[in-house]
Amino acid sequence: GTFYLYFKDKYELQDVLLAKTSHEFFANACKKANQHHFDRLDDKIVFIIDSIINELIDRPNILKFIQKNLSLGLYSEKLTDLLDSEELGIKELFIREVKEKDIPLEYPEMTLFMIIELVSSTVFTSIVEKQPLPIDEFKPHLYKTIRLLINEKEL
């Protein structure tokens, strides 16, 4: 009945819930990061990602629901229409700090997207299946790769 007044089918509802949940993870992690001082953008992004990973570890039901769809909370047009947030999200934070710190990234938004997709696709498998490594052993390798993506011009 009334379900179809808001969503065309159950998949649209699922996408909206996924995007909203993912958005909340990023919003909470960004709030935590804003309570600290970071000289480097890569340190701040790794802190945010680590916060999200730890929350996913602590909430296995949410992890199974989100699976590998972490970026939906950042790149979902449906969610943008539903949320009216005054706070800077990770996307805005990342782009602003790239400019402020004069980090020579040619496409900052694409770099952030690649970071989120990398995290999303690898962390689920590492937490749930412990492949290729258990998450605590995997994190240092992941964070090194994130730093390389952000500091690409320093290579």
Predicted regions and their residues:
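Hydrophobic/aromatic-rich alpha-helical bundle segments in the mid-to-C-terminal region
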Residues: 98-145
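Short, structured helix-loop boundary elements
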Residues: 15, 19, 38, 42, ...
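Generic C-terminal helix-cap and adjacent flexible tail
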Residues: 150-155
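Hydrophobic alpha-helical connector segments
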Residues: 16, 20, 30-58, 115
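Hydrophobic/aromatic residues within well-ordered alpha-helical segments
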Residues: 10, 17, 21-25, 48, ...
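Helix-turn-helix
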Residues: 1-12, 16
